[in-house]
Regions:
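Conserved beta-strand edge residues that scaffold enzyme active sites
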Residues: 99-100, 299, 347-348
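Polybasic, lysine-enriched low-complexity intrinsically disordered terminal tails
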Residues: 1-14
Length: 360
């Protein structure tokens, strides 16, 4: 007869038997397991995106593992594993034996949708993933790992056009959704001309001009980036309200704008360059003008939040900058001459808040 293994009090006749000593109370190791395997979830998403799984399922009747295997050229075994993994991550749902996109994947992971996020997924997979694999090297050397400092002077002047196009397409998808939230959190009704400093693809300008019917904007960036923005502006049908201007924002800023936007820019640069840029912004603005710094802000205690803190490590492998705190930005703004400084918070992929300063 099998012996029961459940632990119970010893019978009376064995009262002198010492109980097994209790194991010391330990915290659960489950969070460590989740951290250690976090890349499993990302690579599942990246592989599904590369196989265009979500495009295959868009608006359709769904699929089975066998149908997916035949459609995209997979063996049925991994096809089933991929579908199961995506369902577990909330990217697919299964009803009546068929897998379909969830509202999340249908809105953001299908190519051609207005707020398509797949560009960022692709960039993270093809550019950032390898660099993060060398994070310890970056920590020891204080140098980036996603590009070679011996070949180029910064992330933004690389010679690989494919990687540059991938970067800006990724930034456009993240910026489009972030700009929408920024426009809801910051009141721009009383401004007429916005200068988007380092405006990239123009995503912020396009979204903000859609929200504010009287607003006009200028995307100010390097010539090859401004050309990308011009194409996006044309696609959006906003060439009558958004223009591009070429230049180096560390050297000059165009005048005749009453609000400046620095969206996901200052985290790329060190403190000295950021302070100089804010002084240049102050000088270029009229009295009553404002500057809006939109960023993933680290809290003033420098304990989180996790997206901002980890983004700061991403800046280590990519740039000379880091993610800064509201207190740091506020001090720099005050030093430059801005007043009535405030921080507003919101929830978006590329930023969690904005620090705003007014020129007296």
């Amino acid at each position: 007869m099998a012996r029961k293994l459940s632990r119970t009090a010893p019978p009376a006749k064995h009262a002198n038997v010492q109980p097994i000593s209790a194991t010391p109370e330990l915290p659960s190791a489950v969070p460590l397991m989740a951290l250690s395997t976090g890349f499993w979830a990302f690579k599942t998403l990246a592989a599904a995106h590369e196989l265009d799984l979500f495009g295959h399922l868009a608006g359709g009747p769904g699929t089975t593992a066998g149908e997916l295997a035949q459609a995209v050229g997979l063996h049925p075994r991994p096809a089933e594993m991929l579908l199961t993994g995506c369902a577990a991550l909330g990217l697919l749902e299964k009803t009546e034996g068929r897998y379909r996109n969830t509202p999340l994947s249908e809105a953001y992971l299908v190519r051609g949708k207005p707020y398509y996020f797949g560009g960022f997924v692709q960039m993270a997979d093809k550019r950032l993933y390898a660099g993060w694999g060398r994070l310890t090297e970056a920590l020891r050397t204080n140098r980036p790992t996603t590009w070679d400092p011996a070949v180029q002077s910064s992330l933004f002047d690389g010679e690989d056009p494919t990687m540059l196009a991938l970067f800006w397409e990724a930034m456009h998808s993240v910026s489009t959704m972030t700009a929408r939230k920024l426009g809801e959190a910051v009141d721009l009704r009383y401004f007429r001309r916005l200068l988007d400093i380092g405006g990239g693809s123009g995503a912020y300008d396009i979204e903000l001009c859609k929200q504010y019917g009287e607003l006009h904007a200028t995307v100010f960036d390097l010539p090859h980036v401004a050309a990308i923005a011009a194409g996006k502006i044309t696609e959006a049908g906003l060439t009558d309200r958004i223009e591009t201007a070429c230049g180096n924002f560390f050297e000059q800023l165009p005048g005749d704008h009453d609000v400046h936007l620095l969206s996901m820019i200052l985290h790329d640069w060190d403190e000295a360059k950021n302070r100089a840029l804010l002084r240049r912004s102050f000088d270029a603005l009229p009295s009553g003008g404002a500057v809006v710094i939109s960023e993933l802000l680290v809290n003033d205690e420098k304990t989180g939040p996790a997206p901002a803190a980890l983004m700061s490590l991403n800046m280590l492998i990519e740039t000379e900058g880091r993610n800064y705190t509201p207190a740091e930005y506020s001090a720099w703004l005050e030093e430059a001459g801005f007043r009535h400084i405030e921080t507003v918070w919101f929830d978006a992929p590329g930023a969690n808040g904005a620090v705003i300063g007014r020129k007296p």
